Amino acid sequence: RIIGILLLLETVMFLVCSGVSFYYRESDMLDFWKAGGITAGVGLLLAALGKGGERQLTRRDGYVLVSFAWVAFSLFGMLPFYIGGYIPDIANAFFETMSGFSSTGATILDDIESLPHGILFWRSMTQWIGGLGIIMFTIAVLPIFGVSGLQVFAAEASGPTHDKVHPRIGITAKWIWSIYAGITALLVGLLMLGGMDWFDSICHAFATTGTGGFSTKQASVAYYNSPYIEYVISIFMFISGINFTLLLLFVNRKFKKFIGNAELKFYFGSVVLFTAVIAIVLYYTSPMGMEESFRKSLFQVISLQTSTGFATDDYMQWTPVLWGLLTIIMLMGACAGSTTGGLKCIRMVILTKVSRNEFKHILHPNAILPVRINKQVISPSIVSTVLAFCFIYISIIVIGTLLMMAMGVGAEESMGCVISSIGNMGPGLGKTCLLY
């Protein structure tokens, strides 16, 4: 039933995109109508079949729902690409759509600017809807249908801890979506002030706040050659990398809790540190001036750490030592509870504190050293979960890299592709640097 509701919501999104096609008088409007008809039909059927079903979801139901929702949304979301012949291969159409909904930003398209506006708008919208989570949106509307969203929230949450700012999870989701939409609207206005037209501004705002990285231009943000646009997008990519429950604290004027958050401090500190180091190296190893070195390094660090994947420069042309630093950034990621990928900063904070405690145990074997974050003790079970998650994450990267190398792909490109895919980055290393 919930999958059916999701598909009906996707149908509404198709109609919005058809409105864009109508505005530009382009033929892809019919493609959206056809896709919408098919999606609405299946959605109504599933909703009818699920009528009268269990309204309380278990944790297992939540995980199953999240998994099926991503697949279902992508399967039907690829229809406009496939029906219109813009991506004639089903596998490629599914790849492009899943890349959008997962906010990965990897693409198989090599002539983006030839696509009609409606298709480009849909391509950008997939990142915005998928960025914060299709399921998070669903949680906000589930109470209307008498369904609990707590287990869905637990399955969708991206960090080791799940923060709520209101006892009712549906209200929390609505607040978060309001902030998400507000940030997007503000960014649209600022980009238009920088010279972007309304269409490109909306599409790039979707890609920025959803940290997806799909651009309406083949050269990405570099197309505009505008320091103003680069700085604005950098700031909003950084904001989008912050835990949205923290942004709620900021909106509610709880500035002390906001500023004192351990994960936010780590996130901000890592951006400052990596930007400073890369800017200095660029200044002395490239023809860039001081301001340009700072701007390029700031943009690329935030773009990769937030897994957005926008590009203003070909970083594979930088000195090789910077490739290693950028790889670390890609692995690390931004904050849990944001639209970003990667391991997440909160796990880095926990790993750092666990490592520090282990060194202290060498000197004081009998000492009891709990892991504390934001003045709260982290339970051993959460610490174990974090360690297991990081081990599995790195193991998948190693195994995936070896498998790609076995298929004849170079080591650099193999590792770049795997890190990019598992972390929802988009760009990778080597030949997959700018277009993946």
Language model features by range: what are they?
Residues 1-436:
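Membrane-proximal intracellular helices of multi-pass ion channels
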